[in-house]
Amino acid sequence: MTDAEIIRLVQEADLDELISLYAHYTAAENLPPLSSDQVQKIWREIERNPGVDYYAVEIEGRIVAACILTITPSFIRGGSGYGVIEHVVTHEDFRRRGLAKKLMVFILDHACTEIMLLSGRDLAPAHKLYEDLGFDKHRRTGFIKFRPKN
């Protein structure tokens, strides 16, 4: 990591930048943008939940990559809990620089003993990164169900 790259927790003051960064993620999934009120409500929920953290890569004061890590307490594996990483995103102008890898390595070095990761099916470069970091796509099978929109 260069001196210009900082990996850190996202703070409330970063929310506008984080939401702008996630436009790169949500556009691919054709998701509508959140209102300011929705963003603030979600942030308050995150602040109240000690097991949820957003991590970011900052370069020259700008957030250019981020993801969320959720750690859930567990009675398995000595009570160390398990983590789930989701919503890994890098700003399109900063891709192919190894920033997502640095972010993931940081999290893997500082989190619990078991970490799962969810990724879209058609993201071959991201999947290669995750496999290079030791994630095993054959170890378990994941299922996702979305609630119908009202």
Which ranges hold each PLM region?
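A short beta-loop-alpha structural element at the N-terminal edge
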Residues: 6-20
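Conserved GNAT-fold acetyl-CoA-binding loop/helix
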Residues: 23-43
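A short helix-loop-beta-strand connector motif used in the catalytic cores of GNAT acetyltransferases and
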Residues: 44-56, 84
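Conserved beta-strand in the GNAT
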Residues: 56, 62-71, 84, 89
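A conserved beta-turn-beta hairpin within the catalytic core of GNAT-like acetyltransferases
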Residues: 73-85, 95, 138
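Conserved acetyl-CoA pyrophosphate-binding loop and the N-cap/start of the following alpha-helix
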Residues: 94-106
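Conserved active-site alpha-helix within GNAT-family acetyltransferase domains
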Residues: 101, 117, 121-139, 145
